Amino acid sequence: MAKRDGAARAGVHAAPVVRVEDGRKVMRVGGVIQSVAVDERYASDVWDAMLPRRQPASALILGLGGGAIAQLMTRRWGPLPMVGVELDPAVVWLARREFGLDQLPHLSIVTADAFAWVAQEAQEARGEQCFDAICVDLYTAGKLAHGVLGASFLRDVRRLLTPRGEVAFNLWRSAYLADQLRRIERVFNVSALDEADDNLIVHAAPRHD
């Protein structure tokens, strides 16, 4: 089953729906699971796999969705400063109401197009990298958002990482996977590949060559 937590940018707009499935609250958009309630009784699969290997001082979540990654980071490391970017105001509203994001005062939620936001932040950073961990979880209508693996976006993400920071990409295993990995490797050093259901989580560090 596909599990993709984040929305990316304008495109196909389906209303998010929250349901209880197998005793667990889930958010679906267009039939695809976008987020799950973090519960000690269940593994969180994809979102657990996206957590950085070491405790970050700060984190950026591109494609906040229902906030599973933010909740898991908080559970593991406490209230570290986080920024979550989510395109859809309806998803943000449900995440606050149904998934407890209002209980995370250390999480700053930005309702915006993640690509435009990253480009602006990278331009304004002027060499001052901001985040130890960045999670890229950007999907539209169940498909990887166009531009996620574009050279300009990848370079902007790298600019927002600290020199020893880590980025995690949530990819869908498909015939395009080898090409997608090559695109990432042009900008980052891939350190680990984690399989989670039909997803592949790519962990990488910025290249400095």
Where are these regions (language model features)?
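Rossmann-like AdoMet
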Residues: 1-56, 75
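Generic beta-structure capping elements
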Residues: 29-32, 136-139, 207
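The AdoMet/dcAdoMet-binding core of the Class I SAM-like
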Residues: 40-163, 174-177, 185, 191, ...
